[in-house]
Structures are given as structure tokens and as C-alpha cells.
């Protein structure tokens, strides 16, 4: 892969390359388009760790995305300066690397359904149960299409939002640059790849998938524009864009550190334990500082992230030749010398925060909410003779999700998952309560 091509300013859905503006580059415009999108605004009421939390100090998906974007920008500028010198790149600034990463990081969770990963699991499980029950008489959709829903993936939904749903009547949706879209694609493959094929190619980028069958052609255009290395001539499957490794690292180090801080703010983790874990990375002289426990944790969090950013940037530069050749497919954070400390943090956070009864209880409720909503709407739009409730449910779909008489089954299911996954935690909860007569 070549950096000059990897940083393509071409916009998906546009034939002409837009004129370069130094004061507001194409990649800065990408960032702005994401910020002003409806899907991004909805992240303010989507779960990061604590569903439906009333504590203003803990993070929602929106705040998490903004923080990851800041870290991504720093990583991009740090490595960009060195890469430009190393490859003698022309007409490219270090800020371009930072701006691409900032935009991609900002959008990295934009496709997540309500209730976080529990929401993804709920959609997968509900679809599989519904399909097994309703499909005894024959195939509703083909195996490639079915895999999109069997393994419903927020990353693929995110690519669909950016390239189609964000502005559905315009080719390319938000019409972001191919560089930003390729960087966004953490898992640059389709959902249906034989397990025996995947088993021969272990790596981080293969653990999930990054686009639905509906957007396969769009992703192919992005991949070919920026020059991603194809992994197989038989399936839609590429090596990652190099900057994707930095986007992943920005996300990994942010949630590792800030989930710890949020656990402290919620009262699930004691001050001494959180201070000890953060200090193992930050390594500062705490005797030089005064302040409350909350201020101490805030200072340690900032110092820890700063050290991790510098470490990850250097690791990327060390592995850059293999990354460009498509020979590297590991987590930069896991290669860090701080990996043991981060694993200890993950274990403590998982046990004390993610498994806390208050968190688990709401996640279970969210699982039921999304699963039942998906089942209700799928039955409504796909049954030939739905029951009276099913007939009425069709009118609950917003205009952009209304089903046309001539649409195929795959498109109908996509419109339902678009609607359900696009809700906020509160929207899904209220709709569930209303449809069951719990509240009106």
C-alpha cells in the first residue's frame, strides 16, 4: 500500500476530486459532516458502560467518541510527521493524518444499537429465533444476506449510516472521503466467509465484519480507491487501512482507562484501587499534587493516556513496513509494554463494573426490549397475513423506514434493523412500554 493513495481525498459518491482548501481541508469537512449528523447526536443517549445512567459524570457513547477522536488526532499527527519525512510525501501535512483519524474515531461507534454490545447480541438472537420459526417453508433470503443478521454488527451498521442512511437520497450518503471511510473500517470483510478460510488467517481484522451485502459495492469502491490489499479473489475481504490500527488503539486505550474512572465515579470501584492501577501506567510523583480523590484520578487518567499515546505511536512507526505490506494484523495496545497493566485494569473493571448487578439488570432488560421490538416489526412487515397488531405496527415505522410493496425481503429486514438499531436507549425503552400498554 502507498501513503499517497491511502490518503485519497476522493469522496464516495462524487466523480470529481474537490479543490483543496488549506483552511478547511477535505478531512476536516468529514469531521464536520459527522458531527452534524443525526446518528452522531443520538450517541448522547446510547450506552457506553452504564445504561440509562443519571450520573452526569459518567460517559455516554457520544462523550466516549469525542474523547477517542481527540486521542486519534494526537496519534495521527505524531506518526504523520515521521511518515512524511520517512517517505518524502508531497502535498500532505501531518495534520491530514490527524484529521482523518479524528473523523474516523468520531464515527467509530455511530452504528451501535441501543444498550451497547448487549443490543447487538439481542438483535442477533432475536433474528435467529424469528427466522428459524418463520422460515420452515423455504428461504426468505440467501445465505450471504442471512449472515448479515445472524451476526448483526454495529461496525457494518456504522458503514451503512455513513455511506447511505446519513443522507439517503444522495449517492454515497454523507459523501465522506475514501481515506476516512477506509480508516473507519475496522473489519474490512463481508459477513459470510467460510470458517475454514478464516481459520487459516488469524488476526484482529477478521474477528467481525465491516459492511452488509447491501453496501458491498460501496466498500469495494472505497477499498480500490485507497489501494487496500485484497485477501481473496472469491470474497469481499481486504487488509486494513494502516491508520485503522491507530483508530483501534485510540478506542482501546480510552475505554480501558476511562471505564476505570467511570467505575470510580459510580461508586463501584474504591479510590485506592483505581489510583493504584492508573499510577502503574502514569508513574508520576503524587506528592507534588494536592486535591480531592476525584481530582487525583483525573490527573492520573490524563497522564496514563499521554504515556499510552506516545507508546502506541512509536509501535506503529516500528511496524509500519509490515503494516503497509499487509503482513501485520495485531492490536498495537496489546503489543505495548503496558499491556499487563491494561489487562489487570480490564479484569478489575469487568468484575466490579460490567458484572455489577445494577449494570447487568438493565442490560438484561435492554436485551428483552430490543429482541421483542425486532421480532414484532419483522413479523409485521414480512408476514403475508399479520395479526391485527402486526397490521398496525407498519404505521409506526417512520417515513424513511416505510416498506414499499415491491421491496425484497432482505431490504425489508434491513429497514427494520435500521429503525431498531438507530434508536437511543430511551427511545427503545419508551416504545417497548407503549406497545405493551405499560405506558401510553
Swiss-Prot record:
Tell me if Cytoplasm is a UniProt keyword of this record. no
- Tell me the GO molecular function terms: dGTPase activity
The name on file for this protein is: Deoxyguanosinetriphosphate triphosphohydrolase-like protein
Species annotation: Synechocystis sp. (strain ATCC 27184 / PCC 6803 / Kazusa)
Q: Which residues, if any, are the signal sequence?
A: none
Q: Which UniProt keywords apply?
A: Hydrolase
Query: Which segments constitute the HD domain?
Result: 61-256
Q: Please provide the Gene Ontology terms (biological process) for this protein.
A: dGTP catabolic process
The similarity annotation says: Belongs to the dGTPase family. Type 3 subfamily.
Instruction: Extract the PANTHER family matched here.
Output: DEOXYGUANOSINETRIPHOSPHATE TRIPHOSPHOHYDROLASE, DEOXYNUCLEOSIDE TRIPHOSPHATE TRIPHOSPHOHYDROLASE
The keyword Hydrolase belongs to this UniProt entry's keyword annotation: yes
Amino acid at each position: 500500500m502507498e501513503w499517497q493513495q491511502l490518503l485519497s481525498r476522493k469522496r464516495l459518491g462524487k466523480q470529481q476530486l474537490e479543490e483543496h482548501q488549506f483552511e478547511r481541508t477535505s478531512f476536516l469537512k468529514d469531521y464536520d459532516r459527522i458531527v452534524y449528523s443525526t446518528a452522531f447526536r443520538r450517541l448522547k443517549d446510547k450506552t457506553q458502560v452504564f445504561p440509562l445512567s443519571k450520573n452526569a459524570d459518567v460517559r455516554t457513547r457520544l462523550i466516549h467518541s469525542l474523547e477517542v477522536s481527540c486521542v486519534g488526532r494526537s496519534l495521527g499527527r505524531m506518526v504523520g510527521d515521521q511518515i512524511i519525512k520517512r517517505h518524502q510525501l508531497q502535498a500532505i501535512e501531518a495534520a491530514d493524518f490527524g484529521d482523518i483519524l479524528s473523523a474516523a474515531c468520531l464515527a467509530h461507534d455511530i452504528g451501535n444499537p441501543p444498550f451497547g454490545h448487549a443490543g447487538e447480541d439481542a438483535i442477533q438472537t432475536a433474528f435467529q429465533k424469528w427466522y428459524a420459526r418463520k422460515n420452515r417453508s423455504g428461504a426468505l433470503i440467501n445465505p450471504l444476506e442471512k449472515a448479515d443478521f445472524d451476526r448483526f454488527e454495529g461496525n457494518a451498521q456504522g458503514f451503512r449510516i455513513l455511506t447511505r442512511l446519513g443522507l439517503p437520497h444522495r449517492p454515497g450518503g454523507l459523501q465522506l472521503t475514501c481515506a476516512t471511510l477506509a480508516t473507519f473500517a475496522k473489519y474490512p470483510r463481508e459477513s459470510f466467509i467460510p470458517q475454514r478460510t478464516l481459520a487459516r488467517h488469524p488476526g484482529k481484522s477478521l474477528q467481525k465484519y465491516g459492511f452488509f451485502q447491501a453496501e458491498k459495492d460501496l466498500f469495494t469502491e472505497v477499498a480500490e480507491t485507497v489501494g487496500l490489499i485484497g485477501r481473496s479473489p472469491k470474497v469481499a475481504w481486504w487488509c486494513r487501512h494502516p491508520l485503522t490500527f491507530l483508530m483501534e488503539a485510540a478506542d482501546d486505550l480510552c475505554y480501558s482507562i476511562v471505564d476505570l474512572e467511570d467505575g470510580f465515579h459510580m461508586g463501584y470501584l474504591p479510590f485506592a484501587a483505581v489510583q493504584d492501577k492508573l499510577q502503574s501506567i502514569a508513574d508520576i510523583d503524587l506528592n507534588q499534587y494536592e486535591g480531592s480523590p476525584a481530582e487525583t484520578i483525573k490527573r492520573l487518567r490524563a497522564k496514563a493516556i499521554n504515556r499510552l499515546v506516545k507508546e502506541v505511536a512509536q509501535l506503529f512507526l516500528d511496524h509500519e513496513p509490515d503494516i503497509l505490506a499487509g503482513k501485520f494484523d495485531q492490536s498495537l495496545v496489546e503489543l505495548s509494554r503496558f499491556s499487563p497493566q491494561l489487562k489487570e485494569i480490564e479484569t478489575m473493571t469487568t468484575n466490579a463494573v460490567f458484572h455489577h448487578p445494577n449494570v447487568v439488570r438493565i442490560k438484561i432488560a435492554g436485551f428483552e426490549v430490543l429482541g421483542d421490538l425486532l421480532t414484532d416489526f419483522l413479523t409485521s412487515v414480512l408476514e403475508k397475513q399479520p395479526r391485527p397488531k402486526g397490521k398496525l405496527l407498519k404505521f409506526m415505522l417512520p417515513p424513511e423506514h416505510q416498506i414499499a410493496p415491491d421491496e425484497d425481503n432482505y431490504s425489508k429486514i434491513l429497514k427494520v434493523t435500521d429503525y431498531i438499531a438507530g434508536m437511543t436507549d430511551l427511545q427503545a425503552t419508551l416504545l417497548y412500554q407503549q406497545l405493551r400498554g405499560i405506558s401510553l
